[in-house]
A protein has these predicted regions:
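Short acidic/polar hinge/loop motifs at secondary-structure boundaries
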Residues: 126, 135, 142-169
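Gram-negative outer-membrane beta-barrel transporters
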Residues: 370-371, 432, 436, 444, ...
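N-terminal periplasmic "start-of-domain" segments of outer-membrane beta-barrel proteins
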Residues: 57-90, 116-120, 135
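Transmembrane beta-barrel wall of Gram-negative outer-membrane proteins
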Residues: 196, 203-232, 237-285, 312-334, ...
């Protein structure tokens, strides 16, 4: 019989302090990625994405090995894992809160709910609105990204994950990613690791209500788990409703002492109002309101931006996922085979300038991972390899947005994509203190688009800019063919070094290449719309002006060379721990998705040369038996390099400094209190010309939890304690106006409470 346990952020050599508000807050802020990375495919644990995940003993590694810290220390790059026990206890759990303790991962909330926050790591995918590329997002080691690399971030639900793996930069190459940003892997719980049942009810301000739960069972040779999460909210702003339903199940089987298998399935349904941006002055006066579009008087235009009240932008999306993972261990050889299929529906009602985009299609994924570990005492496999192939197709239809209703079709496309990624790498020990890790990755991608619209013209509509509720005569423009066939190939070599002068400290350095092809969203964009007219109609009052409704830029793949170095360690007593990484990237052909002063799409372009410099710093400390804290600091200086138009300006949308800190007090055995702050102390550029900026802000939250019994606890929190008015994010444009609607207000002060019961 194999014993199974939850992979926990504890080890015999690194004590942890049980903190109920933040969960188990390890003295090392980032508990070994390895605890999940290299153990996750063990039959008793969930599905890590990393190869070699079962190279360690299949008995209880987390309890018997005592070297979990060493697993993390061996990695020559930025990586972390956040267990569900480490999430802040919250009535409104979001990705930004779940990952608040991880430096280098910048999450900017858009509308406060389960919608489309901007997630960027090291600036990859930074300038998409919304961000839909730049990071490989995985569920149990299989991508929720579509075959072209795009993803819907709202499907990522931290409440449905037992842990989240974070691989920053090239450390994600072993997973099949070659992008600059890296990868996030949401790992499901299993019946072996989490037997019994759990139920969490929560609610609070802005109509927030939710219920989540799971039930798991584990026997000697098999296990199973079912989970669900339902949430909804009215939202902070006037037009701000959102809801999400997620369900999932997995079944594991110990076929033999050498073979384990797991089958899993999940479904997510997401819907949210797009409350849209506000001009800064309007946001400061009343952040709850939504915008009614530009003011036009005597031929002049003030406050350019979308008319949210009339157009009622919204997104409704669903995704079904089914997959399997099979692991075979033959002495020092480990083989891992994964197969997956996703079917995605996405109905995105943009403002009139882009119309309604409906996309529906499926994607198949196949992954083969191999690890060779002849030395059982080694932490990492001597050799590891991954091959991943994703292929998919989708139908895409474009319709006019007529005051929030679906109008005539003006575009129809059949989209196909395929991506092959291959990775191979060594971890070569040079004595007891030094490891050299050379690796090579290759990626080949195909993007095909067949324009099947079939009509000679594309319809257009418009409204009177001076009275935007009054429709103008309909029009039509010639239907230019938008078909294309593009292919991209690139190599991504890397070389990493680690040096361990003591058992508690590690220094590392690495140089790597990254390669990121454009997605269909980059290659096919609606253009020539305005806040009062549809694509192809740049002048609302002139329906006869011939202008293309789509742009299909011939884009190059984005590539970069990155050097990074870091130092992580802890004091001998374990009261202080740190993890710091600095990196510099020379980026070529950075993919930028541009918008004009009204927020209308201009399509994607390649920047010539850009530079990304950053520092990722995490620290954790235990001051007394009852007081502890942690800090996650991210510095980002992303700039154009000798650009003929933008010079050496900062890339819009990237906060230069982001500090997230938390303090925890264990007031008694059953009662804990905590406080946290999210502080952006510097202005953030809204446009690439650096003429408009979002102001600095600080948001303070308070939390508390009380354990009524061993199985029941209650919790409460106050978010944005001082009711600050601030922009949690912005639109990103190339050239802004001072009065432009570009600012997305963060939630005001809110109160949440909940009850958690285990059975």
């Amino acid at each position: 019989m194999i014993t199974h346990r939850r992979v926990c952020l504890k080890s015999a050599t690194r004590p942890s302090v049980a903190l109920s508000v933040f969960g188990t807050l390890s003295l090392r802020l980032f508990c070994s990625t390895a605890a999940v990375v290299f153990l996750g495919s063990e039959s008793g644990n969930a599905q890590s994405a990393a190869p070699g995940a079962t190279v360690l003993d299949t008995i209880v590694v987390s309890a018997l090995r005592g070297d979990l810290q060493e697993l993390l220390d061996e990695l020559a790059g930025g990586a972390a894992v956040v267990s569900a026990a480490e999430y802040p206890v919250s009535g409104h759990m979001t990705v930004s809160r779940a990952l608040a303790a991880v430096p280098g991962v910048v999450v900017q909330d858009f509308f406060g709910g389960n919608d489309q926050p901007r997630i960027q790591i090291r600036g990859s995918g930074l300038q998409q609105n919304p961000v839909e590329r730049g990071v490989l997002v995985l569920q149990d080691g299989l991508p929720i990204n579509r075959a072209d690399g795009s993803y819907i971030v709202g499907f990522a639900n931290p409440r449905q994950a037992d842990a989240i793996e974070v691989f920053r930069g090239y450390t994600a190459n072993r997973l099949g990613a070659t992008v600059l940003g890296g990868a996030l892997n949401f790992i499901s719980a299993t019946g072996w690791a989490d037997p019994g049942a759990e139920l969490v009810a929560r609610g609070g301000s802005f109509g927030q209500a939710g219920l989540s739960g799971q039930v798991g069972y584990g026997a000697d040779r098999y296990d199973g788990l079912f989970r669900f999460d339902v949430s909804r909210r009215d939202g902070f702003r006037d037009y701000n409703e959102s809801s999400r339903v997620s369900v999932g199940a997995n079944v594991g089987l110990q076929v033999s002492d050498r073979v384990t298998a797991r089958i899993f399935a999940g479904y997510a349904d997401l819907g949210f109002d797009v409350a849209g941006p506000l001009p800064k002055s309007v946001m400061e006066a009343d952040p709850r309101q939504v915008f009614t579009g530009p003011r036009v008087s005597m031929g002049s235009v003030q406050f350019p931006g979308p008319n949210v009240v009339r157009d009622r932008p919204r997104r409704d999306a669903s995704q079904f996922l089914v997959g399997s993972r099979t692991t075979v261990e033959l002495d020092e050889h480990t083989f891992d085979v994964a197969l997956g299929y996703t079917y995605t529906k996405d109905n995105f009602r943009f403002p009139i300038s882009s119309g309604i985009r409906h996309t529906e299609g499926g994607d198949f994924t196949g992954v083969l991972r191999y690890a060779f570990k002849p030395d059982e005492t080694a932490t990492l496999p001597l050799f590891e390899a991954t091959a991943q192939y994703v292929v998919g197709s989708a139908s895409r239809d474009y319709f006019l947005n007529q005051q929030g209703e679906q109008g005539a079709r003006f575009g129809q496309n059949a989209l196909d994509a395929a991506t092959l990624s291959v990775h191979a790498g060594f971890n070569l020990p040079l004595g007891a203190q030094v490891t050299v890790s050379p690796a090579i990755s290759f990626s080949h991608s195909v993007r095909d688009n067949d324009d099947v619209y079939g009509e000679a013209t594309r319809p257009t509509i418009a409204y009177n800019p001076a009275n935007p509720s009054i429709a103008l005569p309909n029009g039509a423009v010639p239907a230019e063919n938008t078909s294309y066939s593009r292919s991209y190939s690139g190599w991504a070599p890397s070389l990493g070094f680690t040096y361990r002068p003591t058992e508690t400290q590690t220094l590392f350095a690495a140089v790597s290449r990254s390669f990121e092809p454009p997605t269909h969203d980059d290659l096919l964009a609606t253009v020539n719309g305005t806040p009062n007219s549809s694509p192809g109609r740049p002048n609302p009052g002139n329906p006869g002006t011939a202008a293309p409704a789509f742009r299909t830029p011939d884009l190059d793949a984005q590539s970069a060379t990155t050097v990074e170095a870091g130092w992580r360690g802890r004091t001998g007593a374990g009261h202080l721990s740190w993890d710091v990484v600095a990196y510099y990237s020379w980026v070529n052909n950075e993919l930028l998705s541009l918008r004009d002063v009204t927020g209308a799409s201009l399509g994607a372009v390649n920047a010539d040369d850009t530079r990304h410099f950053g520092v990722e710093l995490g620290m954790g400390a235990t001051f007394t038996d009852w007081l502890s804290g942690r800090i996650a600091y991210t510095f980002q200086d992303f700039r154009f390099h000798d650009d003929p138009v933008r010079g050496s300006n900062r890339l819009a949308g990237a906060p230069r400094h982001l500090l997230q800190a938390a303090l925890q007090v264990q007031a008694s055995e059953n009662w804990s209190l905590g406080a946290s702050i999210r502080w952006v102390p510097d202005r953030t550029p809204v446009d690439n010309m650096n003429t408009l900026f979002a102001d600095p802000y600080a948001v303070v939250d308070l939390r508390s939890e009380y354990r009524i019994s061993d199985t029941v606890s209650v919790f409460g929190e106050v978010t944005n304690l001082f009711d600050a008015t601030y922009a949690s994010s912005t639109l990103i444009v190339d050239q802004a106006r001072p009065d432009q609607a570009a600012f997305l207000p963060g939630d005001g002060r809110a109160f949440y409470a909940g009850l958690k019961a285990t059975f």
